[in-house]
């Protein structure tokens, strides 16, 4: 309440665990990012089935309480390059974020075939995706019912340094390396899995 202005800045993109009018973006940042672990837990405990509606409803309440703000939405292309920047007044966030999400989905990375025996992933990491490996790209998710692309096995070779040992999402892989395992910090990772109610995401592959 002491702040004169609130200016959330964040990427608008497809979420790794739920579908809706708003997914990863300004609304989610207001509810879960700024809410930190307590805010994230309050939203996640209601389940992913209603997550999109809850994020939008909670964000609306925050905007109503804090009207002296505007948001900056960033959209990246398939090469993690910023391709669009939008400044959005507080009163238009709920209206303008959904079409920006549609645009972001049209620009996201895609694997150019639907099926293969094995997918080799050079690096996984929280700086790449909140799920380490983006299920929207790999087709592997402990939550979403994704059928394509389909890979019989997924092998992950390394963890990005910027993840600081957080291996969240590695549970979607079948095989990994000792090199990656040596970088793991369980104390950094497990609170994410517990807060998000996704224990499968933080299990270890072979």
Describe these PLM feature segments.
Residues 2-125, 139, 147-149:
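Conserved, well-structured core segments that form the ligand-binding/active-site neighborhood
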Residues 129:
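Hard-cation-handling environments
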Residues 135-206:
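C-terminal non-catalytic interaction/assembly regions of soluble proteins
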């Amino acid at each position: 309440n002491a702040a004169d202005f609130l200016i959330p800045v964040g990427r608008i993109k497809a979420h790794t665990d739920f579908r809706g009018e708003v997914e990863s973006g300004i609304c989610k940042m207001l509810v879960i990012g700024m809410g930190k672990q307590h805010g994230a837990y309050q939203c996640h405990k209601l389940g992913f089935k209603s997550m999109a509606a809850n994020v939008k409803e909670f964000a609306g309440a925050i905007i109503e309480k804090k009207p002296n703000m505007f948001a900056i939405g960033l959209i990246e292309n398939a090469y993690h390059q910023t391709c669009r920047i939008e400044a959005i007044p507080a009163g238009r966030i709920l209206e303008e974020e959904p079409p920006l999400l549609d645009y972001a989905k049209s620009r996201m990375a895609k694997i150019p075939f639907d099926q293969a025996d094995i997918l080799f992933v050079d690096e996984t990491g929280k700086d790449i995706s909140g799920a380490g490996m983006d299920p929207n790209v790999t087709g592997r998710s402990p939550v979403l019912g994704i059928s394509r692309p389909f890979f019989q096995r997924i092998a992950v070779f390394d963890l990005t340094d910027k993840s600081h040992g957080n291996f969240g999402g590695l549970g979607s892989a079948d095989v990994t390396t000792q090199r990656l395992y040596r970088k793991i910090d369980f104390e950094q990772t497990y609170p994410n899995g517990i807060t998000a109610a996704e224990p499968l995401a933080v299990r270890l592959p072979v």
